[in-house]
From Swiss-Prot:
Modified sites of kind Asymmetric dimethylarginine: 229, 239
A Pfam family recorded for this sequence: Auts2
Modification type Phosphoserine: residues: 281
InterPro entries xref list: AUTS2
UniProt cross-link Glycyl lysine isopeptide (Lys-Gly) (interchain with G-Cter in SUMO2), position: 8
Signal peptide: none
Protein name as it appears in the record: Probable fibrosin-1
Biased composition (Basic and acidic residues): 248-272, 288-311
Keyword DNA-binding appears in the UniProt entry: no
Length: 466
């Protein structure tokens, strides 16, 4: 696939593609230039652009367009330094590298973890031990721990893959990995004191699988045990030893708890005999021992008989309470209705007054009771026709029907009855059947005389303003 693209693809790890840029502040290491062109960096799938007609993606601007000046002004440009000058740090690093290479030539099967490269490491473990205390990495990851001087220090021996690809007959296929046995060769100071106490063949699985197995190496107390212990600020509950917890101690506690209850029952039982008599006459002397009325001795009291008497008294009290409840229920049933409501709430009440009944309304209206004479039904009111005179006893009866006195002619002339028939026949009356002709022939005074009205207008075309 790579034959299609011309040119040579160079790796990014063989040379530094960036140019050193002098620092603006003295004392800082040199960094990258402010603007780096990535046109020269060709990846695996980014071929070089060899066609002159197509512009590159990240290349310069087209030649037809005006190009702006990319030069930095003089007052912003940092002062240039001559290349080739080394500072003290460069000299120290070069010296340490040279010394390390010389030592590796003399002792090539050992790795040199220099403490002077890392003078102080953060954390409670301190610096690394000298390089002579650490063995070759091949012995950490191989089954036999053999040393191969000519082999790559980061590759394992061919025998290391034996237990995984072709397990032997004398090795358990589900056994422990053999790499932990090689890790036990580390000294106590390796990795800040985390070496052999935990990475030996017998102590890795010693706590869970074989607590009684003898340790392979004599080591100080396990430093990892401090992580599983409770801190001093929270003291753990101290369990009493087995010698202090005797078999009888657990059985004695319930007995101690039952003793106060037993004594309380005895006190309650002796309470009626220990109380003094409340209704004792002052003239009656107290009974002595051996006389009548004296308190019986404690030994003569029979507990069983007393309990039987108490049970009989309780049964009698329960029977009396049941009889009283039955009597109360019977009395309540006698004073309650079918729905269980009290009869006082359901007593009959007078029905609401809805007016006289239909026969009473047809018979007529009764006279008031305060009128003289026996009560009787009066005639219904009579409606007179127009022109009928209210004269004679009928007018008086109609006036008395509503308990009204006849109107006085001097006070209420309009409501007064017509004059007696002794008057002259030509006198006009208010309700006379034959009114005088003068009243009928004269026009009413409030109605104006008819005027000639204008002739009606003929319907024409509708006006535009409407």
């Amino acid at each position: 696939m790579f034959e299609k693209y011309p040119g040579k693809m160079e790796g990014l790890f063989r040379h530094n593609p960036y140019m050193a840029f002098p620092p603006a502040v003295p004392g800082l290491p040199p960094g990258l230039p402010p603007a780096v062109s990535f046109g020269s960096l060709q990846g695996a799938f980014q071929p070089k652009n060899t066609n002159p007609e197509l512009p590159p993606r990240l290349g310069p601007v087209l030649s037809g367009l005006p190009q702006k000046g990319t030069q930095i002004p003089d007052h912003f440009r940092p002062p240039l330094r001559k290349p080739g000058k080394w500072c003290a740090m460069h000299v120290r690093v070069a010296y340490m590298i040279l010394r390390h290479q010389e030592k590796m030539k003399g002792d090539s099967h050992k790795l040199d973890f220099r403490n002077d490269l890392l003078p102080c490491l953060p954390g409670p473990y301190g610096a690394l031990p000298p390089g002579q205390e650490l063995s070759h990495p091949a012995s950490l990851f191989t089954a036999t721990g053999a040393v191969h001087a000519a082999a790559n220090p980061f590759t394992t021996a061919p025998g290391a893959h034996g237990p995984f690809l072709s397990p032997s007959t004398h090795i358990d296929p589900f056994g422990r990995p053999t790499s932990f046995a090689s890790l036990a060769a580390l000294s106590n100071g390796a990795f800040g004191g985390l070496g052999s106490p935990t990475f030996n063949s017998s102590a890795v699985f010693a706590q869970k699988e074989s607590p009684g197995a003898p340790p392979a190496f004599a080591s100080p107390p396990d430093p990892w045990g401090r992580l599983h212990r409770s801190p001093l600020a929270f003291p753990a509950w101290v369990r009493p030893p087995e010698t202090a917890r005797t078999p009888g101690s657990d059985k004695e506690r319930p007995m101690e708890r039952r003793e106060p209850s037993v004594t309380k029952e005895e006190k309650d039982r002796d309470l009626p005999f220990s109380r003094p008599q409340l209704r004792v006459s002052p003239a009656t002397p107290k009974a002595r021992a051996g006389e009548e009325g004296a308190r019986p001795a404690k030994e003569s009291v029979r507990v069983k008989e007393e309990r039987k008497e108490e049970a009989a008294a309780a049964a009698a009290a329960a029977a009396a309470a049941a009889a009283a409840a039955a009597a109360a229920a019977a009395a309540a049933a006698a004073t309650t209705g079918p729905q269980g409501l009290h009869l006082l709430l359901e007593r009959p009440r007078p029905p609401p007054f809805l007016g006289p009944s239909l026969p009473e309304r047809c018979a007529g209206f009764p006279e008031p009771t305060w009128l003289a004479g026996p009560p009787r039904l009066a005639r219904p009111p009579r409606f007179y026709e127009a022109g009928e005179e209210l004269t004679g006893p009928g007018a008086m009866a109609a006036a008395r029907l509503y308990s009204l006195d006849p109107a006085h002619p001097l006070l209420y002339s309009r409501l007064a009855p017509p004059p007696p028939p002794t008057a002259t026949p030509g006198t006009p009356h208010l309700l006379s059947k034959t009114p005088p002709g003068a009243l009928l022939g004269a026009p009413p005074p409030l109605v104006p005389a008819p005027r000639p009205s204008s002739p009606p207008r003929a319907p024409g075309p509708a006006r535009a303003d409407r």
